[in-house]
């Protein structure tokens, strides 16, 4: 079975009656994505397109580096796993251990640096 970097997720029609309005609206269940959020679509698309470009230019396979507080790193890791690409994610010290384990379980190398995402991102850009 071929892995993909995103899943087609259901769009569920819901009714809201809060005393002020009676409205129908739609909820997209993006939490069912491999990375658990909508970020799997955008980041996965960017990685796929960038890898195709690198291959067509003869640069070889892409290696992916991401800074993240959690969800973007997990999306990058799951996309890279589906495309057999190496991935490294820099997260700040404030990232929950559970998220670090998820990113690692998706196959990425995790580097913990900085007190917040900005410091993790700065480290990635200059290392």
UniProtKB/Swiss-Prot annotation:
Cross-referenced InterPro entries: Ser/Thr_Dehydratase, Ser/Thr_deHydtase_PyrdxlP-BS, TrpB-like_PALP, TrpB-like_PALP_sf
Sorted UniProt keywords: Cytoplasm, Gluconeogenesis, Lyase, Pyridoxal phosphate
GO molecular function, one term: L-serine ammonia-lyase activity
Pathway it works in: Carbohydrate biosynthesis; gluconeogenesis
Disulfide links within the chain: none
Keyword NADP attached: no
Entry EC number(s): 4.3.1.17
Keyword Cytoplasm: yes
Chain positions with N6-(pyridoxal phosphate)lysine modification: 39
Compartments, as annotated in UniProt: Cytoplasm
Cofactors: pyridoxal 5'-phosphate
GO cellular component, one term: cytoplasm
GO biological process annotation, one example: amino acid metabolic process
Origin superkingdom: Eukaryota
Catalysed reaction, written as an equation: L-serine = pyruvate + NH4(+)
Family: Belongs to the serine/threonine dehydratase family.
Protein name: Putative truncated L-serine dehydratase YIL168W
Organism whose genome encodes this protein: Saccharomyces cerevisiae (strain ATCC 204508 / S288c)
């Amino acid at each position: 079975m071929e892995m993909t970097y995103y899943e087609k997720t259901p769009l569920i029609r819901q009714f809201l009656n809060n005393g002020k309005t009676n409205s129908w609206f739609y909820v997209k269940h993006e939490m069912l994505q491999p990375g658990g959020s909508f970020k799997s679509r955008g980041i996965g698309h960017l990685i796929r397109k960038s890898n195709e470009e690198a291959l067509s230019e003869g640069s070889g396979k892409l290696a992916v580096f991401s800074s993240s507080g959690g969800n973007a790193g997990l999306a990058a890791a799951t996309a890279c796993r589906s495309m057999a690409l190496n991935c490294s994610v820099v997260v700040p010290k404030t990232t929950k251990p559970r998220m670090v384990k998820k990113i690692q379980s998706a196959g990425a190398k995790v580097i913990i640096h900085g007190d917040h995402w900005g410091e993790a991102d700065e480290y990635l850009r200059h290392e």
